[in-house]
């Protein structure tokens, strides 16, 4: 809310947290217990404040995706199962860019449709 008041003409995009894994007592990698709740909270906050939201957790592949990024060839994330690396950042940046372009195209189509109506 403070940012919207301070910069009323600015477009605001909330990017959710990504996946983050931990090892269970059995040694299995799992998404940390609070990640999905945090993503939902961020999504609700964006909706409540009428700002854009991009779900990086889902863009990464959802639950367990951090391990997939770590073990990708070449690796897209670090072996701490928390942080993406440069290649992973470049990959996710491309996905965000595609989402923004798609959203702009949909906006332009809707706008053209409503401008055509009598």
Go through the PLM ranges and name each one.
Residues 6-11:
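A short helix->loop->beta-strand "cap" motif at the edges of active sites that frequently abuts
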Residues 14-15:
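Structural beta-sheet core signal
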């Amino acid at each position: 809310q403070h940012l919207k008041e301070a910069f009323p003409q600015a477009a605001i995009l909330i990017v959710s947290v990504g996946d983050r894994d931990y090892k269970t007592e059995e040694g299995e990698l799992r998404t940390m217990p609070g990640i999905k709740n945090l993503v939902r909270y961020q999504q609700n906050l964006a909706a409540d404040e009428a700002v854009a939201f991009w779900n990086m957790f889902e863009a990464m592949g959802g639950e367990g995706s951090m391990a997939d990024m770590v073990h990708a060839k070449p690796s897209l994330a670090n072996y701490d199962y928390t942080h993406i690396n440069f290649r992973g950042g470049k990959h996710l940046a491309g996905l965000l860019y595609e989402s923004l372009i798609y959203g702009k195209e949909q906006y332009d189509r809707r706008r053209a449709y409503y401008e055509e109506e009598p």
